[in-house]
Amino acid sequence: MKSLKAYAIAAHFGPTMLITTISFLLAARLWWEGPAYLIAFTVFLGQLLIGWSNDIYDYQDDLKHNRVNKPLVSGQLQIEDLKKATFILLPIALLANLLGPLGLKGGAVYLLGVGCGIAYNFYFKFRITSPLVYFIALAALPASIFYAVDRNPPLWVLATSSLLGVAFHFANVLKDLSADRDSNIGGLPQRLGRRASLVIIAILLVIVLTILLNSPISSTFTSRVI
């Protein structure tokens, strides 16, 4: 049981379950609960890949900053075991998303989002373009589920999802700004600093709220599956 908990923590369990829950609720709304559970599970597998690859890549930096809340640093989990689990999971996640209820199109779109998450871990968190992968990945999630039910995702859904993703990126970085700079992590929030990041978060949330207040939410999130 302790080992399972360590794997869950290494997957960044909070954000992973948040994305998984959102996917279930959206799928249940657009389809029905049966495939929604399967979609949530396949989404969960993709999020595991993002979380685990992040902790694998950050291992040396986490050791440097003595982040004992990380299972790899505390010794609850060995890095070779996490690498092995990640490589085993990779083909399973690919097949589950492409051959599952998301379908080839929906699965490919969702996997694009997963790829963005992994690309952030290894490359984009050091670049000024760091918000770009959040923008794409968070749009890919709802888009994949709309495609699964043969519907085109409305632009307002893509816009709000993308902007919320970018806002989350800025908010998520705030607590680690000084440590990130010490580790030469130079994403856009780290370059702009706390005050500018807070302003950007506020602006993005106002834009999202404005879009939502002027969008046909109830009619959009209605199942058309007979």
List PLM regions with ranges.
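Multi-pass alpha-helical membrane architecture of UbiA-family
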Residues: 1-226
